[in-house]
């Protein structure tokens, strides 16, 4: 059994992590923690998330002393703000823990990106260089050796799973940048109350146009430029991405289908549609990314869906942990 703790367990993603880890046969969920300043400190986890009453009734302990918190702990999950993960991940790593960070603090190796897109100067570039990007279907061998796994963002996960097989097999004319229009449920904005996620204010609208921090993450790990526009939808959870691409001359739908099937034939959490395209309702509450596509001439439209809190966050973190420690990849997820 591996002893584990979750920091940031009061939020939506942290709650999903706690539920997965509680039912994982090889994990011993020792502690759920929040920042020392959190208004949720010392509350019972299941009082905040009543669906887990009688299942996970641990207290939310304030994180005041990382050295003590890390004692006897093998695995740490950080469901914390970017700046917080930036500061505390190296301390848990120094204590010998394996860290799965769900923030953006270690996803992009170019340190200059953090000042521009995240608003802080990165001070741990040595860990930027060592962090393994946890796109599970494409980084399994590297994840197996990692001490720090940077779990991808929600939009980058679905975008890359849709585009990587096409780019790796040189099927796209990348002089025409892929155009990614993706809509997320309001849970992507977090649990903290704000005008943005107020019931009466939620509509369907784009945000972060040309400035969203997931743009450089997608581009760095795809190795190509893209046009990415995120949207906020008036539903609780899930992401649907519609991606428009230009094909190289002569590329057929049959080739595209074969490329996808070869890429994901042994990847149980990616489901491919042979007919039609996926709908959001088929992935909400599940750890899958569903992918379908339509071709007309040299134009390709790929549609990908995922639950932003699961395959876009908590489920992928647990998937990476399973890979890292040699467990069944879908352990506790299905």
UniProtKB/Swiss-Prot annotation:
GO biological process, one term: L-arginine biosynthetic process
One MF term in the entry's GO annotations: N-acetyl-gamma-glutamyl-phosphate reductase activity
InterPro entries, per the entry: AGPR_AS, AGPR_type-1, NAD(P)-bd_dom_sf, NAGSA_dehydrogenase, Semialdehyde_DH_NAD-bd
Recorded metabolic or biological pathway in which this protein acts: Amino-acid biosynthesis; L-arginine biosynthesis; N(2)-acetyl-L-ornithine from L-glutamate: step 3/4
EC supergroup of this enzyme: oxidoreductase
Keywords (A to Z) from UniProt: Amino-acid biosynthesis, Arginine biosynthesis, Cytoplasm, NADP, Oxidoreductase
Pfam families: Semialdhyde_dh, Semialdhyde_dhC_1
A single GO cellular-component term on record: cytoplasm
UniProt similarity note: Belongs to the NAGSA dehydrogenase family. Type 1 subfamily.
Function of the protein: Catalyzes the NADPH-dependent reduction of N-acetyl-5-glutamyl phosphate to yield N-acetyl-L-glutamate 5-semialdehyde.
HAMAP family: ArgC_type1 (MF_00150)
PANTHER family: N-ACETYL-GAMMA-GLUTAMYL-PHOSPHATE REDUCTASE, CHLOROPLASTIC-RELATED, N-ACETYL-GAMMA-GLUTAMYL-PHOSPHATE REDUCTASE, CHLOROPLASTIC-RELATED-RELATED
Protein name, per record: N-acetyl-gamma-glutamyl-phosphate reductase
Upper lineage: Bacteria, Pseudomonadati, Pseudomonadota, Gammaproteobacteria, Enterobacterales
């Amino acid at each position: 059994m591996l002893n584990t703790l979750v920091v940031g367990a009061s939020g939506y993603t942290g709650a999903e992590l706690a539920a997965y880890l509680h039912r994982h046969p090889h994990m011993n969920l020792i502690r759920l923690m929040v920042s020392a300043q959190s208004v949720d400190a010392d509350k019972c986890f299941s009082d905040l998330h009543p669906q887990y009453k009688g299942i996970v009734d641990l207290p939310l302990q304030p994180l005041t002393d990382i050295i003590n918190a890390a004692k006897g702990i093998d695995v740490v999950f950080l469901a914390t703000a970017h700046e917080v993960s930036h500061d505390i991940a190296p301390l848990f790593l120094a204590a010998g823990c394996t860290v799965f960070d769900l923030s953006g603090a270690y996803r992009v190796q170019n340190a200059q990106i953090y000042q521009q897109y995240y608003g802080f100067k990165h001070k741990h570039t040595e860990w930027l260089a060592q962090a393994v990007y946890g796109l599970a279907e494409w980084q399994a061998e590297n994840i197996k050796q990692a001490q720090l796994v940077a779990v991808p963002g929600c939009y980058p996960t679905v975008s890359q799973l849709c585009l990587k097989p096409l780019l790796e097999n040189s099927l796209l004319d990348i002089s025409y940048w892929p155009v990614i229009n993706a809509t997320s449920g309001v849970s992507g904005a977090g649990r903290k109350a704000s005008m943005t996620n107020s019931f009466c204010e939620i509509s369907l609208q784009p945000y972060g146009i040309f400035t969203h921090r997931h743009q450089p993450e997608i581009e760095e790990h795809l190795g190509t430029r893209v046009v990415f526009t995120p949207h906020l939808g008036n539903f609780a959870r899930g992401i649907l991405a519609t991606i428009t691409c230009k094909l190289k001359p002569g590329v057929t739908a049959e080739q595209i289908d074969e490329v996808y099937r070869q890429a994901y034939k042994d990847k149980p959490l990616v489901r491919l549609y042979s007919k039609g395209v996926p709908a959001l309702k088929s992935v909400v509450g599940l750890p899958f990314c569903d992918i379908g596509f339509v071709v007309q001439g040299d134009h390709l439209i790929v549609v990908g869906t995922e639950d932003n809190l699961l395959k876009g966050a908590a489920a992928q973190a647990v998937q990476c942990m399973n890979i890292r420690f040699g467990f069944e990849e879908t352990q506790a997820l299905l």
